[in-house]
């Protein structure tokens, strides 16, 4: 059977679907926290994204504790509890093989805050207002015709 070269293309539908299933299972396991390390028990952890490798053997889990405090400590604790979390994912998701879990800091909130700060800068706000006024003027001209 011939394999396709997928370099340059995004994740497959299967990778996206399995990633979402793993994300839900992991978030549920972290929310319940039944068998977790006591240091993690009181921490609320969000899992906004899980990216699967093409062979579905590795799940890269992007996590962020609520409030963004002690991120590195939380990631180290999650990595230390990886075997237990993997078992919890296996109980909740029916897969041929359970992926290995890797934990990384989620930077999407930081990126969103950075973009928001850029849009609030006076020079950018001025440019946006100028574009809005120009668009409104062109619509008025079209209506008069």
Curated annotation (Swiss-Prot):
Keywords: Cytoplasm, Ribosome biogenesis
Intrachain S-S bonds: none
GO cellular component, one term: cytosol
Residue span of region Disordered: 126-145
Highest taxon of source: Bacteria
Molecular function GO terms recorded: ribosomal small subunit binding
Extent of Acidic residues compositional bias: 130-145
GO annotation (BP), single: maturation of SSU-rRNA
Subunit structure: Monomer. Binds 30S ribosomal subunits, but not 50S ribosomal subunits or 70S ribosomes.
Family as reported in the entry's similarity comment: Belongs to the RbfA family.
Protein name: Ribosome-binding factor A
Source organism per UniProt: Azorhizobium caulinodans (strain ATCC 43989 / DSM 5975 / JCM 20966 / LMG 6465 / NBRC 14845 / NCIMB 13405 / ORS 571)
